[in-house]
Amino acid sequence: MVKAVTSSKETAKVEKKKSAPRSGVKKAVSKSQAGVKDSSSPVHKSSKKAPLAEAAVGVIKQVIGAVVDVQFEGPLPNILNALETDNLGNRLVLEVAQHLGENTVRTIAMDTTDGLVRGQKVFDTGTQISVPVGEATLGRIMNVIGEPVDNVGPIATSKTRSIHQEAPEYVEQSTASEILVTGIKVVDLLAPYSKGGKVGLFGGAGVGKTVLIMELINNIAKAHGGYSVFAGVGERTREGNDLYYEMIESRVNVNPKDNNGSTEGSKCALVYGQMNEPPGARARVALSGLTIAESFRDEGQDVLFFVDNIFRFTQAGAEVSALLGRIPSAVGYQPTLATDMGALQERITSTRTGSITSVQAIYVPADDLTDPAPATSFAHLDATTVLSRSIAEKGIYPAVDPLDSFSRMLDPLIVGEEHYTVACQVQTILQRYRSLQDIIAILGMDELSEDDKLLVGRARKIERFLSQPFHVAEAFTGSPGKLVPLEETIKGFKGLCAGEYDNLPEAAFYMVGSIDEAVEKGKRLIAEVSS
């Protein structure tokens, strides 16, 4: 009984001590939001730093996969504080997730815990995980804690910023509506993207999410000319490697090996936490990438923020949640799914200073859009581009579903009357064609009325004209990539809906850019048949 009383007194003392510096922590966070803090070394490589000698020291009590329990003698570190320990000569960062009883905290490891032993010392850094920010990050690949992983040496900056930030105040946010032209016909016509908005690319495995996101980087980053940040969250390491070299080939980034180790002139920073990383890294790497994007935005830049894949962020959260002992909700996801998603998505916003335009690939498990992970993402997006397996099976790429995809920008007050009318006509024709497909499959085309036969012919041409050769797929298709201006896209589909190209064969519209190319291809095909 006496023991219980003394332990509760100790707990009360700890709580008092803990509550006192909270305002100080808040000030430090707001200070880092306003600007950035200086760090004595460009990159935190070593676990033997001066502040750690004076910091609170704990010992490891338990290791369960990616979760590590650490016991402290004195006051406990704050929630979200970064702890550091040495793991076989490497610096291991642990993030405080829970306060348990008996002066113990439960932490999530940002790297493998293989090699940790009970009784090992752990140091409280007194701050949250911070990553380097600023122009020095452009052209570099970093991991979740901001360490460079591209073998080009340390990142030459002293500016760092905590990965946990508050979303901007309502009065700071910008509400202007402007279209971001991508050069991809199906996107620009039927589900246009918003500059400074959030876009989701939904699709199952192997329907082309990553190829589409790479084409968007190629088209927008080149035309846009501003800075981009790419966060690779739990995806294939091979794709991350390919993207790095493709960015160098397309001159979005500068190869440091050809430039005396410098990446000056690069336009994109890359932050990777790939499939082989522990769940802690995959659950935080999106925040690390977003922090770099926010820093550019606060300096007055219009930033592009690409995430591949948001589902892996949710998946990592579910793994961590289970290890932390939380009771899972529907389909095994974490009970805090909506909160975790909201905390990330609300930070991706435009302010009066600058903008963040976000493009997020979202894997759809078993092609089920009602799954809680993709369904939770829908609420936060300005535009959704749904990739369909049935369209991919027809060989039409990008395999964007023109009827399931949606954008709040498709409004006559934003895009103009002509664009809106043409988009509605295209969707009406495709919807009618979809409703007739069962009749065609059972009875054949001959049983349709003349009007329906004409409509089906136009719908099939529209379907093929929605395909487009990509720059990033040139090596596989052998067709040069096409970037189509919005005016050309509207002109082409307007003519197709009006029946101006009824005399041309369907094949003329497959994998071409503008309508003029389709007309030329059609004439060539007709000439070949007649000869």
Swiss-Prot record:
Claim: Ribosomal protein is one of the keywords in the record: no
Keyword Translocase applies: yes
Chief location bin: membrane
Catalytic reaction(s) noted: ATP + H2O + 4 H(+)(in) = ADP + phosphate + 5 H(+)(out)
Name of one Pfam family that matches: ATP-synt_ab_N
Compositional bias (Polar residues): 30-44
Positions bound to ATP: G203, G204, A205, G206, V207, G208, K209, T210
Compartments where located: Cell inner membrane
Record note on quaternary structure: F-type ATPases have 2 components, CF(1) - the catalytic core - and CF(0) - the membrane proton channel. CF(1) has five subunits: alpha(3), beta(3), gamma(1), delta(1), epsilon(1). CF(0) has three main subunits: a(1), b(2) and c(9-12). The alpha and beta chains form an alternating ring which encloses part of the gamma chain. CF(1) is attached to CF(0) by a central stalk formed by the gamma and epsilon chains, while a peripheral stalk is formed by the delta and b chains.
Family: Belongs to the ATPase alpha/beta chains family.
HAMAP family linked to this entry: ATP_synth_beta_bact
Name assigned to this protein: ATP synthase subunit beta
